[in-house]
Amino acid sequence: MSMPTYKVCCDKCDFQAWSYKLWGAKEYVDSKGEEIPLDTTFSWCNKCQSIEPIESFDNTATYVSKLHQSLAAIKADTNSIIKLFFTRLMSSVRVTDKYFLNEAQVYARKIEQDIKRKGTEKCLTCGSNNVELYAGDKSIGWHLVPEVDGENAFINIQHPNCGGEFYIPSKLNRIGMALERRIFSLDGLEIKNIENE
């Protein structure tokens, strides 16, 4: 299966970086073996001297909202004696509640991780924390698609050490490759890399 990818180029030098670096599942694993989602952004790593996948702790509000939704679902299933009786009686309802409880715990751990680690983001390629984050309206995400017909889309981000400006050529490419699952410690250091078929 192929997926669309784009490259980020510099208008002053021959620099190129490909968005497929963001592909594949990336997760933290804590000391108990529990998985926590790992969000990434495409930003500059001073050690790699390239645009690389960098940890992102900017989605905390989204996880807070998801946590509220999971807790609301649990509350809706347990807010009366009759519902509690049927929950006890019917295993399918217990499974659903257990799912929402597990989901809520994952979101709570992710929120804690985001708050604890914000400002200490690391490059997921080399492990360095000497990074320049492109966030907000200066973010380069995997979902970014230039909306320009036949022209390069300049993204208003300067190429460090060069002074050129990054742009995305209007032509998207499709690449087929095996996706990998990468596991990281809570400190952002890679533990293992698993290729998925």
Stretches found by the model and what they are:
Residues 1-7, 197:
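His-enriched metal-coordination microenvironments in redox/metal-binding proteins
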Residues 6-42, 47-103, 109-110, 117-156, ...:
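Short recognition patches in nucleic-acid-associated and regulatory proteins
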Residues 161-165, 169-197:
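Extended, charged low-complexity segments
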